[in-house]
Each structure stands twice: as structure tokens, then as C-alpha cells.
């Protein structure tokens, strides 16, 4: 289990806000919700039992070039010989250059079966991370990056262990 590293992408939006609110009985819940839809941002990250080990945000969507940049500049230095990088079946993940970049540091590449996000603990990580980011109400890329830096402390090793356990990786 120590060698498993799950890599995935998540879509974010700069107009994300809390989904639920509470108020004193008889009072109306009040909060700020942007009127216009903000820009889309892709979050690429890697999760192991220590937590979120490598994350990068990019405006717009992810393609092979963006993912290759993530692998070579962000993920690669965090990997070790014997690491097993587990990814879903996004087209960018199957690029030969991506496989070569990961294997050049001594790691192996494995793919999840099609349509099986329930086997990937990073999906649960994204859920908790998005909840945190909604509460931060980041409206610019800079504030989103700062919120991401704060989120690394918000996600604990106990969370990661629980997500791995929930996905059946300890049975």
C-alpha cells in the first residue's frame, strides 16, 4: 500500500460557493453567491497514504501537454523507485510520453478498470477538498492557489488512510 500513488483531475470553478447554510430558527440563512459563472480550472493531483503529495491548478481543461508538464515538473520529483502510479482512463494518461516520464524515475504505471471511480481514493479526496474550497470562496486563480496551499493542511493522513480503506485497499 505504501507504494500506491493515485493520480486524477478534478474540475473547479471560480464561482464555487457553499451548497448548504444554517441559521437560527426563524431566521434566514445569508451568504454570498456570485451572479456570474467564474472561469473553469483543472486541478491535477496525486494521493498516497501520506495525503495529497503533488497538486497543480491550470486554467481551463487538461490535455496531454498539460498532463505531461504535471508529470515531469510536479509529480516526477515526488515519486520514488518502486512507486505504482494508478490512473483512470483519461486519454492523456495513456500517452506514451507520460508512461516514459513516470517510468524514468523508477515508478510503474497501472490503470483502473473503466468506469470504476469507486476504486480510487483520490475521488473521495476531491470531495473533501471541494467542500473546503467552497468555504474559502476563492474568486481568482491566486486566491484559489492560496486556498489549495491551506487545503494541504486540511487533508490529513487519517483522511487518506480512511479513503484507501473505503476503497477496499486494506482487505
List PLM regions with ranges.
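RNase H-like polynucleotidyl transferase catalytic core
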Residues: 29-35, 105-124
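Acidic, metal-coordinating catalytic cores used for nucleic-acid/nucleotide bond scission
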Residues: 13, 62, 85-98, 114-119
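Short coil/turn segments at beta-strand junctions that form active-site/ligand-binding loops
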Residues: 1-3, 81-83, 107
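Short, basic/hydrophobic alpha-helical segments
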Residues: 66-84
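Mobile genetic element proteins and their domesticated derivatives, centered on retroelements
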Residues: 6-8, 45, 71, 88, ...
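Extended, low-complexity cationic-aromatic segments
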Residues: 1-72, 169
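Short beta-strand segments
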Residues: 6-7, 83-87, 111-113, 165
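C-terminal anion-handling pockets and recognition modules
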Residues: 1-4, 122-171
